[in-house]
Amino acid sequence: SLQAGALTTTFTSSQGLMLMIPAMYAMGGQFLPSVMHIASRVVTSNHHSIFGDHTDFMTCRTTGYAMLMSSSPQEAMDLAAVAHLSAIKAGYAFMHCFDGFRTSHEMQRIEALDYEDLRPLMDTEALDAFRHKSLNPEHPTNRGNNVNPDIYFQCKEGANVKAAVVPETVQHYMDEINKITGRDYKLFNYYGAEDAEEVIVVMCSASEAVKETVDFLNANGRKVGLVQIHLYRPFSVEHFAAAIPASCK
């Protein structure tokens, strides 16, 4: 459907995601703006479990997909929009991940985004360009060719150039969602003491529990903080370093 110019999304996790990996390499490598929403769960190994775990999406780190992480139902609502908007503008495949059951089945009141607020944020020129590149007998193209190592290497290096624009694109749309919602999303959100000497780095629902721990420890004389990862892939070292207080040891 993506090759035909249709905006395509799916929802999956665990073993279902494992079955998609071969196709993900093709979609990620061809920069098709698919979006997958992943309620991350255990992948069966020596035992079976249906509960939350990062095994499934961690297995997909080399597929060429960007990975956006949510820690709560509200974040899942807001960052889902960021994933879709960024996929179109950057011309990049996205996974939007949140913890299975802990977040995906949590009963919580949220503020739903209005589609009319999101409509002006869509990059229509990028959308038209994506549809123009779709398979069409009126303007045939050749894709998925067999190439020698020299060309393969150049294509891989070209993918790095494409990935380099993703962090700024994601932050741009986070800023737009911040304007609509009044919330404060960044690629890496910092929480805790401004002069923290110890900082823990987490992503997804663990950050909600860590925030309570940070509050408790700071109230008892410790200087601690939390860096919450939202954009895990492509990982921006520059933005990550900027989120950590200079006092951190």
Please report, for each region that a protein language model flagged, where it lies by residue.
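Thiamine diphosphate
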Residues: 1-60, 65-88, 174-249
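Structural beta-sheet core signal
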Residues: 10, 36, 96, 200-201, ...
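Cofactor-binding loop segments of dinucleotide-utilizing enzymes, especially the Rossmann-like FAD-
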Residues: 13, 39, 99, 203, ...
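Short helix/loop capping segments that flank catalytic or ligand/cofactor-binding pockets
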Residues: 20, 46, 105-107, 209-211
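Glycine-rich beta-alpha junction loops
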Residues: 41-42, 98-105, 204-206
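Hydrophobic alpha-helical scaffolding
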Residues: 46, 69, 73, 142, ...
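Conformationally flexible catalytic loops at phosphate/diphosphate-handling active centers
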Residues: 94-189
